[in-house]
Each structure stands twice: as structure tokens, then as C-alpha cells.
A protein has these predicted regions:
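Basic/aromatic-enriched alpha-helical hairpins
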Residues: 1-48, 67-69
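Active-site/catalytic core of tyrosine-dependent DNA strand-transfer enzymes
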Residues: 1-5, 98-103, 150, 168-214
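Short basic/aromatic active-site micro-motif
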Residues: 22, 118-122, 214-232
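C-terminal secondary-structure termini that scaffold catalytic or DNA-interacting sites
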Residues: 36, 107, 111-114, 177-184, ...
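C-terminal flanking helix
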Residues: 65-68, 72, 258
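Short, polar N-cap/turn motifs at the start of nucleic acid-interacting alpha helices
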Residues: 79, 144-152, 214-215, 234-253, ...
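Catalytic-site neighborhood detector that most strongly recognizes the C-terminal catalytic loop/helix
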Residues: 89, 96, 154-161, 236, ...
Length: 280
């Protein structure tokens, strides 16, 4: 990955300069150029789509800082000018993917799949976007809880107790497409244990690196689902019900699901699926 940053971002911007002549201003200028997308370009192979952004720029500065630190230890230069660089601010915690970013993210997911990225991780990420579920709810999901034809999942325990949570057909299709492992109750089983899959964050980081998207965490996927629901003009109460924040979706002691939530889950997950697949 460091080699990729060097060839894609550092060398095009600073490759003609002598290492002894580089200043803090040069490196901060490089960072600004990467943020602005000056080094953005398509590329073949596992690297996928290369763009700019604050995260890409910060990582490039970190790579250059390490290189120049090594040069300092070897006596090639007296001082590491990258050590004093002020990194650009990271994305706020309320980050969510815009419609354009969702399309770009979908492209990166397809590129990752073509590059033999972990299929369980990719499926877990897709389901998170299609449902707005928390990371723990996604990874701990068990087949016996899923009622795809009826449009809901019956969680025996969540942050607010047992819940029936609405899902759309696109989410149900994603779940149904997962191969069952004999003896495992999990929709997303672990690679080497009886537990569930745990590598979702690492897969997400690699997909985001391909897409050039910064500050994207599993919680951002949850925010994105809520944001799309808002753009489709669903009420705050309905969105809270979809996310499991409010008791609206559960009545009569965990045996009835509000039909309005099923309709909303269908529309939101279909819209997100279309954007991911390049149709929306």
C-alpha cells in the first residue's frame, strides 16, 4: 500500500525534487493537491479507482514522513520536514455517503469483488447499507431470526430489548444469497472459528481505499441509510423505527410489525441498492 501511495500521489507531485530541498511547505502543498484530487486517476488491478480526499492525503503524508525519518537516521538529511506537517481535518462523526458517493462506493465494491475481496465482508457491508443495522447486529445475525418473506428480522436482544426490525426485499435477497455453513447459526460465519465473521471493518477500509472515500465506518453506513430515508421524505418517527431507536415497530409484545415500516424499508433499501448497482 505504501508503494501505491508513492507511485500514485507522492512521486507525481514531488518526484522531481531533491529530498534535501524539500520543505514543510512543499509537503503541505502536496497534501493540499491530493485533497483537491490533482493526482486522481483510474488504474488497473487491485488498486482499483484512485482518487484524492483527506484520508488519502493524510496517509500519503504519513508515508512520506516515514521515508524522510529513515533518511534522517541515515544522515542523508539533517531534519525531517514532514514531522511538522499539520494533517487536514478528518471527516466529522456525522458523516454519511451522498448519492454520488454511494454510486462510487458501489463501483469500488464491484472492483473489490473482481479482485477477490472477502465475499462475506462485502455482503455484510452491503446488508448494513440496505438495513441501517448496527455492526454487531449485522455480524451477529442468525438464520433463525430472519423472516425474509414477511419482511422482518426478529432480534431476541438489542440495545433496547427484543425487536422486530423491518427489512426490504433487497436486504432479504442479500441474506438469502449467503451460503450456509453446516453447524453455524450465523448468516456471516467466521473464517476459522465457530463464531461470526469479524473482518468487516478491514474489508470496508479496503473498499473505501479503492473508492477514495474518507471517514467511512460501519456507523456511517447506518447514518447513510437514515439519510436516504430522509431524502425519500419518511418521517423522523419512521426512520427511528427502522433504526430500532423507537418502539413504533414493535407492539403487542414482540408479535406485530408496523406495516408502514415494511413499506419504508422496501423503498429505502431499493433506492440504496439501485445506487450501489449503478441504476439510480
Amino acid at each position: 500500500m505504501d508503494e501505491s501511495r508513492i507511485e500514485t500521489h507522492i512521486r507525481p507531485l514531488l518526484g522531481a525534487r531533491s529530498i534535501k530541498g524539500l520543505t514543510l511547505w512543499d509537503i503541505e502543498g502536496m497534501q493540499a493537491d491530493i485533497v483537491a484530487g490533482r493526482t486522481a486517476k483510474p488504474r488497473n488491478g487491485r488498486g482499483g479507482i484512485s482518487t484524492g480526499g483527506t484520508g488519502v492525503a493524510s496517509r500519503a503524508v504519513g508515508t512520506l514522513r516515514s521515508i524522510m525519518g529513515h533518511a534522517t537516521r541515515l544522515g542523508v538529511i539533517e531534519k525531517n520536514p514532514a514531522a511538522g506537517v499539520r494533517l487536514v481535518a478528518s471527516a466529522p462523526k456525522t458523516r454519511r455517503l451522498s448519492f454520488a458517493e454511494l454510486r462510487l462506493f458501489g463501483q469500488a465494491m464491484r472492483a473489490a469483488e473482481a479482485d477477490a475481496e472477502h465475499p462475506v465482508g462485502l455482503a455484510a457491508i452491503r446488508l448494513a447499507l440496505l438495513t441501517g443495522f448496527r455492526r454487531g447486529e449485522i455480524l451477529g445475525l442468525q438464520h433463525s431470526w430472519v423472516h425474509g418473506a414477511e419482511g422482518y428480522i426478529a432480534f431476541p436482544d438489542t440495545k433496547t430489548g427484543p425487536q422486530m426490525r423491518a427489512i426490504g426485499p433487497k436486504a432479504a435477497e442479500c441474506i438469502a444469497a449467503q451460503p450456509r455453513r453446516p453447524g453455524s447459526p450465523y448468516v456471516f460465519p467466521g473464517d476459522w472459528s465457530d463464531g461470526h465473521f469479524i473482518g468487516m471493518v478491514r474489508v470496508l477500509e479496503r473498499v473505501c481505499d479503492k473508492a477514495g472515500l474518507d471517514g467511512v465506518t460501519p456507523h456511517v453506513l447506518r447514518h447513510t441509510f437514515a439519510s436516504v430515508a430522509g431524502n425519500l421524505n419518511f418521517s423522523e418517527l419512521t426512520i427511528k423505527g427502522l433504526l430500532g431507536h423507537a418502539p413504533r415497530g414493535v407492539t403487542q409484545g414482540y408479535v406485530h410489525l408496523d406495516i408502514a415500516l415494511v413499506v419504508a424499508a422496501d423503498k429505502v433499501s431499493t433506492a440504496i441498492s439501485d445506487m450501489l448497482d449503478g441504476r439510480g
